[in-house]
C-alpha cells in the first residue's frame, strides 16, 4: 500500500539532468519514505497509549479547529461535553457524534514539542442557523469593553474571516481531500504540529511565510464597517482574502518568467471586491477576482512560451526578457502597428449564419459524423469546434484549408500558382530529410519547380508557423506570430527545393526572409489562425495585414470556408 501511495512521488530518470542526480533524488525519496513509516508508527503508538478510539479519528483528521483554550499540555482524553465559548460560532457546524480537535491557535507558536491538541467528543446538536446578522451585536463583540485580549479583526482567535488564514498556517492542504487520505496521514494531520508543518508543499510554504509576515491593520468598531458596500478600491488595506490571492498567484506562476513585470496593474485591483465578514449578508455579490480577457490571454501566452522553450530549444533558445517584452509591447515598445484588416473577399450573410450555427451547436452523438468530406479529409463537428474562440486548430482543419488555397489557385488563373503541403510534411522533412518527402509532390501531382509559392505548415509541438518557398520573389520565408527564430527551417527548405527541382532552379541568390512587422498574436490560442491566414494572403500576393483583433471574425470566415468548400 505504501509503495502504491508513494508511486507518484518517485523520481523518474528522464526528469533528471544526470544519472548522479537521479541516484541522489532516488535515495532522498527512499529516506523520506522510511521517515514517514517511522512517523506513522510513533503516531499509532501514541494513540494506543492514550487509548484514543481509532474509529472516531477518521472524522477529525485534517480538520483541527481553533478555539480560545489556553492549555498547552492537555491530554488526549474524551469529554462528554463540548466547551462553551463566546466564539463557538467560528467552529464548524457539528452533528451528534462529531469529534473536533481544539487547540490554542494564538499560542501555537509557543507550544513545545511535547504539546498535544485536545480531542473532545461533542454530542450536542448545534443550530445550523447560528449567525451574526445584527451590526450592533457585531459592534459589541469587538467593543473595548469586551473581555477579549484583542480588538483586531485579523486576530486568529476572533476573526471568522481570518480563520482560513490561521488554519492554513499550520495545517497543509493535501493534493487529495482529507477524507481520501490514509488513516496514518490523517492521524499525522491531527496530532503532530511539526509533521504537518514539514509536509507543506512549496506553494503553501510560500503562503504561510507571507501570512506570518502579515501585519494586520487595526479594526475600528464603528457601525460603518458593517455596510453592504464594497471596500474602497483605492484603499491600501490588505485583507486576508487579498493576501491569499496574491500569494496563490505568485506560487502558481513563480516558474514563469517576467510575470511580475508583464501584469498590468489596475487601481481597482488593490483590494478584493468582497466584504471581509462572512456573516454579513449582501444583496449584491461582486466578483472576488476581476480577471479580464487581457490577463487570460497573457497567461495563456506565457504558458505557450514556457512550453516552447522546454520542447523546442531550436527556435526559442536565444529568447531573453527584452525580446519577450518587445513582443508583448507592455514595457519597452509597442508591437508593430498594423492597419485594420479590411475583408477583400466576398462573405455572404447566409454563409456567416451557417458557420455560426455549427460553431454554436453543442456537441452530441452526431458530432463524430462528417459535415463535409473533401480532399479525402472528413470534417466533423468536433473538428469545426476548434475554430471557436480560445481553441487550438487541429491538423484536419489546417490541412483542409491548405487544400482550399491550392484548389483556388488552379481554378482562378489570375492568381499565382501555389501548392500547400499538409501538416506532416515538415515533420518528415526534419526527421528523415529529403528521403522522407521525395514522393509527396508526385502523389499530389504537382511540379514544385512550376509553382510560384509552396506553403509548408511548421508544427513546433504546441505552436504553428508558416514557411513559404516563394519563387516569384526569390526567397524563403518564415512567418511566426511569436517572432521566434527560424532555427533550421531555411536550411531544410533550401535543401529540399534544390533536391526536388534537381538543380533546375538557381537558388544561390535567394534570401532568407522574415518580416519584422508581421502580425503577432497576444494569446496562446490563435497561432493556427495566424498561420493559415498568412498563407491565404501570400497566395493572393497581397500584404499580410491583419491583427489580433481580427481573430474572432477570421475564425468565422475559416469555418464558413470549410463548410462551403470555398475560401471567403
Curated annotation (Swiss-Prot):
Active site (UniProt): 463, 480, 527
Pfam family, one: Peptidase_C48
SUPFAM superfamilies in UniProt: Cysteine proteinases (SSF54001)
UniProt biased composition (Polar residues): 66-77, 116-126
Gene Ontology molecular function terms on file: deSUMOylase activity; SUMO-specific endopeptidase activity
Record keywords: Hydrolase, Protease, Thiol protease, Ubl conjugation pathway
Top EC class for this record: hydrolase
Coiled-coil region: none
A single GO BP: positive regulation of mitotic recombination-dependent replication fork processing
Biased composition annotated in UniProt, kind: Basic and acidic residues: 83-96
Chain positions covered by the region annotation Disordered: 64-127
Transmembrane segments: none
Keyword Protease included in the entry's annotation: yes
EC annotation from Swiss-Prot or TrEMBL: 3.4.22.-
Family indicated by similarity: Belongs to the peptidase C48 family.
Record protein name field: Ubiquitin-like-specific protease 1
Gene coding for it: ulp1
